[in-house]
Amino acid sequence: MISRFKTAARILVKGDSQKNNRGPIPAITAEDVAEIKQFFSREKFFIFGHARSGTTLLMRLIRLHPDVHCNYQAHFFTRQPLLRSLVDTPEAEEWLRRKSNRWNNGRDLSPLILRAAADFIMERDAAKEGKQIVGDKSPSSTIHGQAVRDLHAVYPDAKLIYIVRDGRDVLISERFRNLVEESKFLKPEDKRILEGLRKDPTQFTDGTHSIFTRAVVQRVVEGWVRNVQETEEEGRRLFGANYCSLRYEDLLSRPFDEMQRLWNILGVQADPSLERDIANELSSNPDEEWQSRRNEDIASFLPKGRSGNWQRLFTSRDKSLFKEIAGEMLMKWGYEKELNW
């Protein structure tokens, strides 16, 4: 009785904090998956990767197959607000698990709501294309391993494809994207670098000036390491044989072999004619064209989509800082054999 009075007094003074939070959203069950596939039967896959790692190129290539559709940036699990926000309120929880609701059989319907919403969005698009396998490409740079866990809670039966790129080129590409866009997040020091790049770009290729601030290197590289490590660990742990990873550089050097492997994982065969289609797709770079239209004098300084751009621009400080943060990860993924680069 005393504890009840204390609880009542606390709520009167501070409000009921529990009222603002719903309970954990349960993972979908195998029975639920089997049932929902009666209505949404297409097989699903998801492409994750750190931003500027080739996720868009991979999306463009994978949907060349006549049976595979892929669209992009749904961010169901990879960027706030997430898919779960549809049911992530106390009011939604109360409605979906209400005991008087004869449709829920005494269970929380939240995971079914999430699955049905995402299934409909993807399958509607795939139906228009006449394709039977459908996936979404969304970079997972901000949520890392949690994105994999959230995906598995709704799509334990899906395929997860993760693309990795040399973190040094990721750093270069992300930096130039922000400079080309003249991002609102640029700080005064960043703006001075941008102005210097406009006046005399050669000073950034002779090792005397860096296009990075120390803070930018630390933020991007630490994020890259965390993204690669957590996605690989959680992907293998949760998805097992339904998880696969590839390197962006391998996709560029042997595109048909890599795409054959991925299509096989999705359960479809690749006709030899697709090799020509892949070559045609690789001959264009929409991102490069867009950046040139946006800010040509900056965009033209760096060839887009190539591997090894970092070698032109890294200063000794950049190398040292990168090695300190991510040297081991570079070696783990076969980008370097030792740390004396």
Task: Name each region found by the language model.
Residues 1-119, 128, 180-181, 187-194, ...:
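PAPS-dependent sulfotransferase catalytic core
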Residues 38, 101, 203-215, 302-306:
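Short glycine/proline-rich turn/loop motifs
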Residues 52-53, 64-65, 75-77, 140-142, ...:
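Short, solvent-exposed loop/turn segments at secondary-structure junctions
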Residues 80, 277-285:
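Post-kinase regulatory C-tail/linker adjacent to protein kinase catalytic domains
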Residues 83-85, 128-133, 138-273, 285-296:
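PAPS-dependent sulfotransferase catalytic domain
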Residues 268-278, 338-339:
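Short, surface-exposed acidic
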Residues 303-341:
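C-terminal accessory extensions appended to soluble enzyme cores
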